[in-house]
Design a protein with these regions (language model features):
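Charge-rich, solvent-exposed alpha-helical interaction surfaces
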Residues: 6, 10-13, 64, 87-101
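Low-complexity, intrinsically disordered/propeptide-like segments
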Residues: 14-17, 42, 51, 71, ...
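Generic alpha-helix signal with a bias toward terminal, lower-confidence helices
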Residues: 23, 28, 53-57, 96-97
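Intrinsically disordered, low-complexity regulatory segments enriched in Ser/Thr/Pro
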Residues: 36-87
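Negatively charged, low-complexity tracts enriched in Asp/Glu with abundant Ser/Thr
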Residues: 1-37, 75-81, 103-106
Length: 106
């Protein structure tokens, strides 16, 4: 099962792309954060807009920062805690924008 082309159009308009289908009913979509983090989001194909909405709603900025702060300056991770925080906030906004745009599609 694949996502409908109308959803792919929304993804492309916001610089997201379909990365892969997992074979178990999920799809991986990808984008890059302002600081260059490779974001790969895995959600259900069925009810795709709702799945993205739930992922965006549940994305925890603090948890994301905690995961990265111990790797500051490594492998492309920003060395500044402030930049990591700002980037995590931007990721949350990217996810919310994508979710909102997908939910508007009829």
């Amino acid at each position: 099962m694949k996502i409908h082309s109308k959803y792919e159009d929304v993804l492309e308009s916001l610089d997201w792309r379909v990365c892969d289908y997992t074979g178990d009913g999920r799809v991986e979509i990808e984008n890059y954060s302002p600081a260059g983090e490779d974001l790969i989001v895995c959600v259900e194909v069925e009810n795709f807009p709702e799945s993205v909405y739930e992922y965006a709603r549940d994305f925890d900025v603090d948890e994301h920062v905690e995961m990265l702060v111990g790797h500051r300056g490594e492998g492309g991770c920003p060395s500044s805690v402030r930049e990591i925080i700002d980037d995590a906030d931007a990721i949350k906004e990217m996810l919310k924008e994508l979710a909102n745009r997908l939910m508007e599609v009829e």
